[in-house]
Amino acid sequence: MWGTMCLLAVPTSIFAQAPPQPSNHYIGSDQCGLCHVDIYKNFYKNPHFKSIASGKEAPEKTGCEGCHGPGGDHMAAGGGAATIRAFSQMTPTQVLDTCLGCHSQDFSRANIRRSAHTEADVVCTNCHSIHGSAPDANPPKFLLAKKQAELCYGCHEPIRAQFSMPVKHRVNEGVIQCTDCHNPHGTFAASWGTGAGSNLEAASHNNEESCLKCHVDKRGPFVFEHASVRVEGCTACHVPHGSTNAKLLKRPVVFTVCLECHNGAGTFGRENLGVVIQSASHNMLDPRYQQCTLCHVRIHGSNSDARFLR
């Protein structure tokens, strides 16, 4: 005798497989850490870790894959630079585009695509290490690949010698840094001197702002302005890095600096700028008159005397 057979209706959905992941999908930074142990172990010290910690970013802007792209293919292939966004294999433009995907909001980087560095194919990874800052690089949050001065000297080697001169700004001693005066990401400031190329100075009206933020007593405005300061800036008389001359002057004796303008040879078009240059009225062969600033003591500008005597 046959028993009663019951047929149970079982939903077919419980046997259905999950849809396959696209081959190159986001796998999460934990998966990266299975192979890249040292990098992953120290990643929490990296400012880029904030993209994970915030919990607010989309996968394409989070952790390792925020910079290197989705890691699905890379993991399936067992590694290899061809299956991931490897910065060492990217063009300068690709590197810049990747970094600016997140780092485009700061005004100090607003002109980076037209900066002298970018035009020379010097981009982010030439100075920065995305996985962590060098031990002697300060501050760590900037992820510098080396100590800042050493990074700059890598290309600007002649500047290293200037900072070893008897009179200099104390960069080698760590008192100030190159970026206290220069913006390596580009600037909208005009260049030092007429017709000169961009030196990436921090933004200012006439390029003297980098100097005046330390030398505040020279800022003015003054009732009687020194025309060379107003028109050409500090480097009309001074060199910025280092010199064998006192006060970083361009020439060893003060009067030879002054005679570059006050020589009686004309105004060289400066009248168009509202500047009339007086020729020197003393005998410059007389040693008594060769230290102009002994009398013209307010040479950067005065509020009481048009000849800067007080």
What are these regions (language model features)?
Residues 13-310:
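Short sequence/structural segments immediately N-terminal
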